[in-house]
Swiss-Prot record:
Homotetramer. Forms an RuvA(8)-RuvB(12)-Holliday junction (HJ) complex. HJ DNA is sandwiched between 2 RuvA tetramers; dsDNA enters through RuvA and exits via RuvB. An RuvB hexamer assembles on each DNA strand where it exits the tetramer. Each RuvB hexamer is contacted by two RuvA subunits (via domain III) on 2 adjacent RuvB subunits; this complex drives branch migration. In the full resolvosome a probable DNA-RuvA(4)-RuvB(12)-RuvC(2) complex forms which resolves the HJ. It is found in: Cytoplasm. Residues 1-64 are annotated as: Domain I. GO terms for cellular component: cytoplasm; Holliday junction helicase complex; Holliday junction resolvase complex. Belongs to the RuvA family. Has three domains with a flexible linker between the domains II and III and assumes an 'L' shape. Domain III is highly mobile and contacts RuvB. GO terms for biological process: DNA recombination; DNA repair. One of its GO terms (molecular function) is ATP binding. Residues 144-153 are annotated as: Flexible linker. Residues 65-143 are annotated as: Domain II. It comes from Allorhizobium ampelinum (strain ATCC BAA-846 / DSM 112012 / S4). Keywords: Cytoplasm, DNA damage, DNA recombination, DNA repair, DNA-binding. The RuvA-RuvB-RuvC complex processes Holliday junction (HJ) DNA during genetic recombination and DNA repair, while the RuvA-RuvB complex plays an important role in the rescue of blocked DNA replication forks via replication fork reversal (RFR). RuvA specifically binds to HJ cruciform DNA, conferring on it an open structure. The RuvB hexamer acts as an ATP-dependent pump, pulling dsDNA into and through the RuvAB complex. HJ branch migration allows RuvC to scan DNA until it finds its consensus sequence, where it cleaves and resolves the cruciform DNA. This is Holliday junction branch migration complex subunit RuvA.
């Protein structure tokens, strides 16, 4: 099994990169987000690899971090999500944004990924809600929201407030952190309008 490739970029395709390792070139399939972060041909590259072995083929999937690779595997534990859809999700959302979306039960955020319909998005946020924090890698906003929300799912006001802040130009991480802080500082039970005000107050500090 191949766990990591270290070499130079030989060629970048639409959905893959060719990695030259001491004269042997490996095809690693990557998300569009990962491909956009790569350098130019001839530059050094390090990719974390997930190896798929099938009866008639061997396929490599490449990632910029071990965390992204873990998410790739976790996403595929949900029915209806294969390698192609998992890569599409990781191209649409960073691991941190994905963790936030699951913590908030934010189905529309996940459904933005090509190939992810409402039913698959629902399965993802439902089945992964108790698994996602282990893959955030730090005490991020997803964990903060989970702590404030307890074991329940995010209420409509919470989801609406996060969505409103992102519409104002804040990143999902910033919005989720702000709403988590708002809930902690007296916003529990508040409607979306109040949560938005409290969230903006947190962001202005």
């Amino acid at each position: 099994m191949i766990g990591k490739l270290k070499g130079t970029i030989d060629e970048i395709g639409d959905d893959h990169v060719l990695v030259d390792v001491h004269g042997v070139c490996y095809v690693a399939h990557c998300s569009s987000r990962t491909l956009a972060r790569l350098g130019s041909p001839g530059e050094a590259i390090v990719l974390f690899i997930e190896t798929y072995v099938r009866e008639d083929q061997l396929k490599l999937f490449g990632f910029m971090s071990a965390l992204e690779r873990e998410w790739f595997n976790l996403l595929q534990s949900v029915q209806g999500v294969g390698a192609k859809v998992a890569l599409a999700i990781l191209a649409t959302l960073t691991p941190s944004e994905l963790a936030n979306a699951i913590a908030l039960q934010d189905k529309p955020a996940i459904a933005r990924a090509p190939g992810v319909g409402p039913k698959v998005a629902l399965r993802l946020v439902t089945e992964l809600k108790n698994k996602a924090p282990a893959f955030t890698g730090d005490a991020g906003s997803a964990i903060g929201l989970k702590q404030e929300l307890g074991e329940g799912v995010a209420s409509a006001p919470v989801s609406d407030a996060v969505s409103a802040l992102t519409n104002l130009g804040y990143s999902r991480d910033q919005a989720a952190n702000a709403i988590a802080a708002a809930l902690k500082n007296g916003g529990e039970g508040a409607d979306s309008a109040k949560l938005i005000r409290l969230g903006l107050k947190e962001l202005s500090r």
